[in-house]
Design a protein with these regions (language model features):
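Class I (Rossmann-like) S-adenosyl-L-methionine-dependent methyltransferase catalytic domain
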Residues: 1-42, 47-95, 139-223
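Short amphipathic alpha-helical segment that frequently serves as the phosphate-/nucleotide-binding helix
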Residues: 28-31, 121-125
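GHKL-family ATP-binding catalytic core of two-component histidine kinases
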Residues: 97-99
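Short catalytic micro-motifs in class I SAM-dependent methyltransferases
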Residues: 110-114
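A short glycine-rich, Lys/Arg-flanked "PGG" loop and its adjoining helix->strand segment in the class I
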Residues: 122-134
Length: 223
């Protein structure tokens, strides 16, 4: 059962089951920053792990307490085949099956772009904040709003439909989102940002794009 804040538009499960395993995801993993905040025995989760590429890189670097979570059964099956030594779990809601403050680090790679709504994104980040220990690392890699004509046309075309500038439909039948820096700042208000890198990536459809990698430490509010 899905969270009331996380809709079918946010999960788009049929698309990821059929098209996801064939897509190439190219956001690089910054191991230098990871090892600065997370020792090799850290418990690390990858929310929206896809076919496990990022966790595979972490395992190769020596991390061994790794958990991948994804809604898509096809993606989880592909991840288990590629990396049998890593734990991968299919989830059916945003709720992460782990206790409060039980995780040292969390990856959110190319996930927000696949979750078009504010509420859907908030639900994910809130749940990651719950499971991260105080001072635990959240590492987001995603796409900024772009400035090229192709993307500007798509933003303008679908802004009224979705009510958010930067949300648009792709021809293959999936809805995605590019992000305003102010929204990312609002979304991550329960974290202390400790680094922000900007870079060029190639999207899952082979197009160049401006991306960001955001690193923040979990702040726990007093009860």
């Amino acid at each position: 059962m899905q969270s009331t804040d996380y809709t079918d538009l946010d999960s788009q499960l049929e698309y990821w089951n059929t098209e996801g395993p064939q897509k190439a995801f190219a956001h690089p993993l910054n191991l230098r920053r990871m090892t600065h905040w997370l020792s090799l025995d850290s418990v690390i989760i990858d929310f929206g792990c896809g076919y496990g590429r990022s966790l595979g890189e972490l395992a190769e670097a020596g991390y061994d307490n790794l958990i991948g979570l994804d809604f898509s059964p096809a993606m989880i099956e592909a991840a288990r085949e590629r990396f049998p030594e890593i734990t991968f779990e299919q989830i059916e809601s945003v709720k992460i099956p782990l206790p409060d403050e039980s995780v040292d680090g969390a990856l959110l790679f190319s996930v927000l772009t696949c979750v078009p709504t504010d509420d859907g994104q908030r639900a994910i980040v809130k749940e990651l904040h719950r499971v991260l220990r105080r001072g635990g690392l959240l590492y987001i890699s995603d796409l900024w709003l772009q400035s090229d004509e192709r993307n500007l046309t798509r933003y303008a075309r679908d802004e009224q439909k979705y009510g958010t500038y930067g949300v648009f439909d792709l021809p293959e039948g999936v809805t995605v989102r590019h992000h305003d820096p102010k929204w990312i700042e609002t979304l991550t208000s329960d974290f202390e940002m400790v680094a922000l890198d900007e870079l060029e990536v190639v999207t899952m459809n082979g197009n160049p794009a401006r991306a960001f990698q955001w690193f923040g430490l979990s702040l726990k509010r007093e009860q």
